[in-house]
UniProtKB/Swiss-Prot annotation:
Topology of this chain in the membrane: Peripheral membrane protein
Alphabetical UniProt keywords: ATP-binding, Cell inner membrane, Cell membrane, Membrane, Nucleotide-binding, Phosphate transport, Translocase, Transport
Quaternary structure note: The complex is composed of two ATP-binding proteins (PstB), two transmembrane proteins (PstC and PstA) and a solute-binding protein (PstS).
Xref: CDD domains: ABC_PstB_phosphate_transporter
GO cellular component annotations of the record: plasma membrane
Family the UniProt entry places it in: Belongs to the ABC transporter superfamily. Phosphate importer (TC 3.A.1.7) family.
One of the record's GO molecular function terms: ATP binding
Domain of life: Bacteria
Name of the gene: pstB
UniProt name for this protein: Phosphate import ATP-binding protein PstB
Length: 290
């Protein structure tokens, strides 16, 4: 299927979008197209279904997320991508009327097993939310909190080292090293989000989930976070939900397109944007609906 240079059109705000189309029921009974599975998977999802009371939000989704990749998840508002992301570290457990069935594994171990403790799971699979949410503590204590709670340190020198290393990895150290005991809430929005990333890194996660991490930030702060994602992917597996197709195109190696709770297509990012296999994907990335 030819998307007429859909990848390039993402960066052209004046591109012709064509006539709006209603694809709301088109092709939804078909299997996911593209390449959702991998021999290099860090996390694997099989036949995942999610319900809020009797409303089904995710329909039979299967997908692998590779080690040390940035996987982007795109789709219209309400398509289920954030619900899917929260299944990867069981954040949906905190929603009273939410039920999940299917299989989600981390290094081939079922994270929904009845004996799985969610506290160490969420240390291994951290999450950065849409809006920066630093604790009402100092910059230092924001980063130190996780290692102390999880018993990762026994000496203050160890904690100091973790705080500095985490802030460096989050590209924040040089900006805050002289005011570590100032309130984290006093930082700019972009700095607060990088502080939240440092806080996540501090407990040595294996996977970092990002749910619209730049939606509340200005373009300069967004660029810093995007650069940071590329650096972090050398040591971490990253899954990001974004409404910005431009961002998905810039930061990710693979992209998954969701529509009405179904995973429509997964493939290398450039291929998704230049030669999508499904009409729904093509219609979305070329602006014909969304």
């Amino acid at each position: 299927m030819n998307s007429k240079s859909g990848y390039n059109r993402l960066f052209d705000p004046m591109a012709e979008t064509g006539q709006a189309l209603d694809f709301s029921q088109h092709g939804l009974g078909q299997k996911t197209v593209g390449n959702p599975f991998s021999a290099k998977a860090k996390m694997s999802v099989r036949n995942l279904n999610v319900y809020y009371d009797d409303k089904q939000a995710i329909h039979d989704v299967s997908l692998d997320i590779n080690r040390n990749e940035v996987m982007a998840m795109i789709g219209p508002s309400g398509c289920g991508k954030s619900t899917f992301l929260r299944c990867l570290n069981r954040m949906n457990d905190t929603i009273e009327n939410c039920s999940v069935n299917g299989e989600v594994t981390l290094d081939e171990q079922d994270i929904y097993h009845k004996k799985q403790d969610v506290v160490p799971l969420r240390a291994r699979v951290g999450i950065v939310f849409q809006k920066p949410n630093p604790f009402p503590k100092s910059i230092y204590e924001n980063v130190a909190y996780g290692p102390k709670v999880h018993g990762l340190v026994s000496r203050r020198a160890q904690l100091d080292e973790i705080v500095e290393d985490s802030l460096r990895k989050a590209s924040l150290w040089d900006e805050v090293k002289d005011r570590l005991f100032s309130p984290g809430t006093g930082l700019s929005g972009g700095q607060q989000q990088r502080l939240c990333i440092a806080r996540t890194i501090a407990v040595s996660p294996e996977v970092i989930l990002m749910d619209e991490p730049c939606s509340a930030l200005d373009p300069i702060a967004t660029a810093r976070i995007e650069e940071l994602m590329a650096e972090l992917s050398q040591n971490f597996t990253i899954a990001i939900v974004t409404h910005s197709m431009q961002q998905a195109a810039r930061v990710s190696s693979r992209t998954a397109y969701f529509h009405m709770g179904r995973l429509i297509e997964v493939n290398d990012t450039r291929r998704v944007f230049t030669n999508p296999e499904h009409e729904l994907t093509e219609a979305y990335i070329t602006g014909r609906f969304g």
